[in-house]
Design a protein with these regions (language model features):
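Conserved Lys-Pro-Asp/Glu-containing loop-to-beta segment of HAD-superfamily phosphomonoesterases
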Residues: 2, 97-122, 127
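Lumenal/extracellular "mature" regions of secretory-pathway glycan-modifying transferases
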Residues: 75-78, 91-98, 133-134
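Acidic, Mg2+-coordinating phosphoryl-transfer loop and its flanking beta/alpha structural elements
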Residues: 114-151
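A short acidic, often aromatic-flanked loop/helix-cap motif at beta-alpha or helix-coil junctions
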Residues: 93, 101-107, 136-144
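A structural micro-motif
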Residues: 1, 56, 91-94, 114, ...
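A short acidic, amphipathic alpha-helical/loop segment
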Residues: 43-50, 107-109, 126-129
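Acidic carboxylate-rich catalytic motifs and surrounding loops in phosphoryl-/glycosyl-chemistry enzymes
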Residues: 62-67, 94-104
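Alpha-helical substrate-recognition element adjacent to the catalytic core
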Residues: 2-87
C-alpha cells in the first residue's frame, strides 16, 4: 500500500505565499522554494517512518504550474524535489511524480489503489483508491489511524 501526498495546498502552503500567482506567471520558483509546510514536520516524519517500517510506501504526486514553459517546468521539478528533501530530510520517498498541470494522478501512481491526500476535489473524485481531503481530515490524525490499524 502506498500513501501519496499532493504538495501545493496539501503539505506545502503555496497559496499562502504572498503573490504566489504573479510569481508563477513570471516563471519564478520562489513560492515553491519558500512555501511553508502545512503539516507538523516532526510528526509527519515520525508516522511515515513507522508506516514505512510496516511495509507502506510513500509517494508524492504534484502538478506543475498551469500553462508553463518546458524550461520553467524543469526548474520547478528540481525546486519541488529540493523542497521535499529540505523540509522532510528523514523521509525516503519511494515515488516522486511532478507532472503537467491537470494530469490524472491515478494514471501516474504505481499503486492505483493507494491512499491520496489532495486538496483538489476533482483529483479526489478520479482517484481509484482512498482519497482524503486534507482540509476536512487532519493528515497527522489520519496517519495515526492508519498506524493503529497496523498495531
Amino acid at each position: 500500500m502506498t500513501i501519496y501526498f499532493d504538495m501545493d495546498g496539501t503539505i506545502a502552503d503555496l497559496y499562502g505565499f504572498d503573490g504566489w500567482l504573479s510569481h508563477l506567471r513570471a516563471e519564478s520558483v520562489t513560492p515553491y522554494a519558500e512555501a511553508a509546510p502545512l503539516v507538523n514536520i516532526g510528526e509527519l516524519q515520525l508516522y511515515l517512518s513507522i508506516l514505512q517500517n510496516r511495509g507502506y510506501k510513500i509517494g508524492v504526486i504534484s502538478w506543475l504550474a498551469k500553462g508553463s514553459s518546458k524550461s520553467y517546468d524543469k526548474i520547478v521539478r528540481k525546486t519541488k524535489k529540493n523542497w521535499l528533501r529540505a523540509t522532510f530530510p528523514e523521509i525516503h520517498f519511494d515515488e516522486i511524480h511532478i507532472v503537467k498541470y491537470g494530469t490524472r494522478k491515478d494514471y501516474v501512481a504505481k499503486d492505483k489503489f493507494g491512499i491520496l491526500f489532495d486538496d483538489d476535489e476533482e483529483v479526489r473524485k478520479n482517484w481509484r483508491g482512498l482519497p482524503i481531503n486534507p482540509n476536512m481530515k487532519d493528515i497527522i490524525e489520519k496517519l495515526k489511524e492508519i498506524k493503529e490499524l497496523t498495531d
